[in-house]
Amino acid sequence: MKISRRSFLASLSLLPAVLARAQSQVPANKNVKWAVSLNLWGYFPGTKITDILDVMRDTGFPGIRLTGFPGFLNKYSITQAQLHTELSKRGLSAVTISWNSLSVDPAMRQQTLDNARDAMKFLADFGANHLVVFSPGLNRGGTAAPGAFEEMCKRCNEIGELAGTMGFTAGLHNHMGQMVQTREQIDQFMAAVDPKLFGFSPDTAHLHLAGCDVVGMIDKYKSRIKFLDYKDAKLPAAAPAPAAAPAAAANGTAAGTAAARPAGGGGFIQNIYDLGDGEVDFPGCHRVLKGMGYKGWICVDLDIARLGPMADYKRCGAYVVNKLEPIYL
């Protein structure tokens, strides 16, 4: 079939609108910039780091929070320089590290500070300036000892002071099963650390599962937030196990018949959902961010990707575009 020149030119006039619609589900990354967490791909053995970066590029999540530092370099058979190159060629950024080396043992003080320094030196090479600090897990020795909580707060002040000398900020990541998980523990911690030295890097799912008012907590500590996780969740009683779906490879393509979830399942993991599928009030959170003029990263930390990382991050990106960006870009 022949197409007239007039028809061809007319079709060209529609191209910008078509392209705009095609891109409309990709987050704008203006005031709020969106990141993924490397942790998810630990549930997809054999994934190459370049596959992960391609998912980020194609779904509009240009940042990554690194996990398992420094061991992830060996796990993914990549050097720091190679990672820098692969990120740069795709226009992506390493934005922080999930830092799990905080110790309440006074004898470990210097090693703890040295480990924090190493993590921030690594991040500085990528232009990052924030360290996400996890409190010690309750299964670690010494966390229930008298004075342990105070020792943790003291160490965080020291980490925050160190961060300031390196041009960094540091903030606490609340987490179930760790020393800081409930509203009372968060309040106690935030009151004990120096607000000039140490901030808050909240996780919405862990707030929700701990029974917190998510929007209220973000609003309460908004002046101390430099980084946060948007992660959706349902309380266990409201979260029946999802029906088994075909597994998906790291790039979102079908890869067998087993459910695409971590081996062995797990109660906590099954309470985590794509943005908008759970109970967290993200529009409320976003209105707080708008009110404070937040400019920074939000990590959409998927602990499970039932349809595969590519498909689930596309779903999350669509939620960001359709539900959150009308509130605040």
Locations of regions flagged by a protein language model:
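Boundary/entry segment of secreted carbohydrate-active catalytic domains
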Residues: 27-47
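Acidic/histidine-rich catalytic cores of soluble enzymes
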Residues: 31, 36, 63-64, 158-279
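Conserved, mostly hydrophobic/aromatic
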Residues: 56, 64, 87, 123, ...
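Glycine-rich, proline-tolerant flexible connector loops at the mouths of alpha/beta enzymes
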Residues: 65-84, 138-139
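Catalytic domains of carbohydrate-active enzymes, especially glycoside hydrolases
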Residues: 51-69
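Active-site acidic/histidine proton-transfer and metal-coordination neighborhood
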Residues: 11-19, 23-28, 86-89, 105-200, ...
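N-terminal secretory signal peptides
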Residues: 1-3, 16
